[in-house]
Amino acid sequence: MFVIKRNGYKENVMFDKITSRIRKLCYGLNTDHIDPIKIAMKVIQGIYNGVTTVELDTLAAEIAATCTTQHPDYAILAARIAVSNLHKETKKLFSEVMEDLFNYVNPKNGKHSPIISSITMDIVNKYKDKLNSVIIYERDFSYNYFGFKTLEKSYLLKINNKIVERPQHMLMRVAVGIHQWDIDSAIETYNLLSEKWFTHASPTLFNAGTSRHQMSSCFLLNMIDDSIEGIYDTLKRCALISKMAGGIGLSISNIRASGSYISGTNGISNGIIPMLRVYNNTARYIDQGGNKRPGVMAIYLEPWHSDIMAFLDLKKNTGNEEHRTRDLFIALWIPDLFMKRVKDDGEWSLMCPDECPGLDNVWGDEFERLYTLYERERRYKSIIKARVVWKAIIESQIETGTPFILYKDACNKKSNQQNLGTIKCSNLCTEIIQYADANEVAVCNLASVALNMFVIDGRFDFLKLKDVVKVIVRNLNKIIDINYYPIPEAEISNKRHRPIGIGVQGLADAFILLNYPFDSLEAQDLNKKIFETIYYGALEASCELAEKEGPYDTYVGSYASNGILQYDLWNVVPSDLWNWEPLKDKIRTYGLRNSLLVAPMPTASTAQILGNNESVEPYTSNIYTRRVLSGEFQVVNPHLLRVLTERKLWNDEIKNRIMADGGSIQNTNLPEDIKRVYKTIWEIPQKTIIKMAADRGAFIDQSQSMNIHIADPSYSKLTSMHFYGWSLGLKTGMYYLRTKPASAPIQFTLDKDKIKPPVVCDSEICTSCSG
């Protein structure tokens, strides 16, 4: 039996050679637990005549990954095999790889079709010796197997469907793409990215330095006008943004309701549902970034709109397909008055924006005055109990996980962009709160800090966090100026207001590394101090930029220009960790370069790349299933696996018990200190999760993607959660509602083939807003 080598030559299969290759990659691993011979034997079983060495490496990596539940070092070995395989298939020098990407010729038409931009190529050519010399390829081996496979699938650039970039090449491309001729800053960014202190968002990793360098994650639009022209002009904007891998939030509260008169044609409106069907089909049609992500939009509606009940049914699993839009996400932009009416079991008037104009343009007391005026004038379409609408909201959430909930008054009252006008919607992932109108499309560029990295020698390094945040601010601020904008209205908005969004990932990992239970007082205190530090560092960096370049165009009249910062709007006094008054004085003197700074996003894909838990979320399970080409296998929370292995507590009995309990360790006989630290999201009171969101909210000037997890949701549980979040002043009341599937049938065996832990889908989830 023979294998085909990379150079095309045939060679007889040699077991010893396969074993030797695997053994070479076991350096530094625990040799008491890692068995290269076992991996090699399984590889031999999968060999067929004419198999390539690339396929052998791929198989060996997958086999090693399947052994991860035996010891965490197998995950490292799997990644090393996969990375080593890529290194053998790609050129080493960064400059040569960039040259190949620039010189790409489309084989279909013979035209020069550069994948990277000419300016990127010029910079690389001028500084190639320096850039080539600072890249440290060993850092590629720091990715875990699934992080590396995520990079391979969507992030590393390809020529004719063959990957040509290594992870380090990608990171240097991103750094050069952002900083261009400022090589020292590019190298600083490269090192921080490659050491995993932070990551830029997926669109930045995809597109920085390329011919179409669209690096922004989020776009917020208002419907231009309640007319055929306005609706279809807005649709075109959405299509052009979606084409360039942007996630969309769209407010439609100004579109007339069904049954309303249309003066131009003397007809009757069909309302928002047929219109949204058109938007849904556009989302389905547009394929973003060459299959990197399908088109996605979140549609925002205020609950006074007469079509609200039909809107809440849009994602239901049953009913007339003509009234469903399964490819759009739905979200509610809820005024406080609605919550008060629900609380008091009052009446709620449903209105048409054509007959009751201006409701979407006002908030707070002004909204209440206008709404009650229309009620007194009997301009409403109908009156129902507020709780009837509320019940429909809850039922939709229990069935579909949506609509998302955002509080209109909190979003406007506590926004540093309040001086621009009324904010009418958020984005696809509910963390961006920015002003948009018919002439401006709001944009946000994102990045996320890997909080686990700042746990150094058993303590959290706040000073290092502040320093890294300041680099991120400078990077995101540069992206605003060099970005490729899909539509001019987006460029106008972004350059006028210059908002950015800094988020986090690995909060749960940081708590675990410090041995803090997620719901402990220590974790709650650290949660506040982390976000206080991020906000402080971001403000300091933005003020320093304003000192050099001037404040953003619409700074005058903002809260910050009057010495009011986000925590003031929450009536919160910061800790004594940072000296706020001198910073406020400096901001009064120089202003800020950016109107908004902090926005914790979901980080779905980038957290997977860096091997961290998502965003600010606790772990959802301590064991789950991964799907790969060779089948399914179990992955255990790496922190838990390591601590149990070190304490000689890990065995098949414990593994099967955790699998039988759906990823929980609370019913095992493990020590109580471990059980407390490794509670899953289902075992942590949601009230604590919401309270921690409010605690950090005082230092988040945009908002945060906050999921609610309730294993067995009910009307009363969800209502209680929503009203608690609203009472605490949250801007985002809920991103998704996550529930547990119905209980599995009684399990008669603990055999791993019979027990199915939760499956984690390996597809891209909200890559656009993934920081």
Curated annotation (Swiss-Prot):
GO terms for biological process: deoxyribonucleotide biosynthetic process. DTTP binds at D226, S227, I228, K243, R256. Maximal ribonucleotide reductase activity requires the presence of Mg(2+) ions. It is an enzyme of class 1 (oxidoreductase). ATP binds at K5, R6, E11, N12, V13, M14, F15, D16, K17, T53, D57, K88. It catalyses: a 2'-deoxyribonucleoside 5'-diphosphate + [thioredoxin]-disulfide + H2O = a ribonucleoside 5'-diphosphate + [thioredoxin]-dithiol. This is Ribonucleoside-diphosphate reductase large subunit. It comes from Vaccinia virus (strain Western Reserve) (VACV). The gene is OPG080.
